[in-house]
Amino acid sequence: EIHFTRTTHGIMANITHFCSRTKSRTWGKDGWQKIVVCIIADGRQKVHPRTLNALAAMGVYQDGIAKNIVNQKPVNAHVYEYTTQVSLDPDLKFKGAEKGIMPCQIIFCLKERNEKKLNSHRWFFNAFGRALTPNVCILLDVGTKPGPTALYHLWKAFDQDSNVAGAAGEIKAGKGKGWLGLFNPLVAS
């Protein structure tokens, strides 16, 4: 759940940045209403229970509702939708409006079976992309912590040039507190 909350809290910090752009024609204080965060978990038996607990604490997930079979037919996925007003930081501390966190619209898709990453991408684009018709899609793996303005800069690349079809951000390894992560040769390299 630490990796999951690192990513979601980073996304919510970015939503706060979008909303802080009060002179923008696109964003501003209600900018959060133009953003939907889609979370896709690859397999109900594979997702860590503490990640589900984090989603439940944010109000997104309810335990005990998902069923394997409905009307004698196997279920492919379970979809939960909620607008949360709280975030869990990587230390599992609640952050809300008092800390500047803006509301966040979340769709959580809990796939019944583990069918790997590309299948999850298909779910995102074919199911949610068609329903939401977004102008820009940004895919993040769990554990990736976007900087507080990173998603804005990715969005801006698309906004400034309609010929841009893809963009990639810079990835930096987390050095840890007191740069202790540098003792790990993979991080240090």
UniProtKB/Swiss-Prot annotation:
GO MF, one annotated term = chitin synthase activity
What is the catalytic activity of this protein? [(1->4)-N-acetyl-beta-D-glucosaminyl](n) + UDP-N-acetyl-alpha-D-glucosamine = [(1->4)-N-acetyl-beta-D-glucosaminyl](n+1) + UDP + H(+)
- EC no. given is 2.4.1.16
> One Gene Ontology cellular component annotation?
plasma membrane
Short name of one Pfam family = Chitin_synth_1
Q: Name one GO biological process term.
A: chitin biosynthetic process
Uppermost EC category: transferase
Keywords tagged on the record: Cell membrane, Cell wall biogenesis/degradation, Glycosyltransferase, Membrane, Transferase, Transmembrane
Q: How does it sit in the membrane?
A: Multi-pass membrane protein
What residue range is the signal peptide?
A: none
Compartments, as annotated in UniProt: Cell membrane
Enumerate the PANTHER family for this protein.
CHITIN SYNTHASE (PTHR22914), CHITIN SYNTHASE 2 (PTHR22914:SF38)
Q: Which family does it belong to?
A: Belongs to the chitin synthase family. Class II subfamily.
Q: What does this protein do?
A: Polymerizes chitin, a structural polymer of the cell wall and septum, by transferring the sugar moiety of UDP-GlcNAc to the non-reducing end of the growing chitin polymer.
Q: Know the name of this protein?
A: Chitin synthase 3
State the species of origin: Ajellomyces capsulatus (Darling's disease fungus)
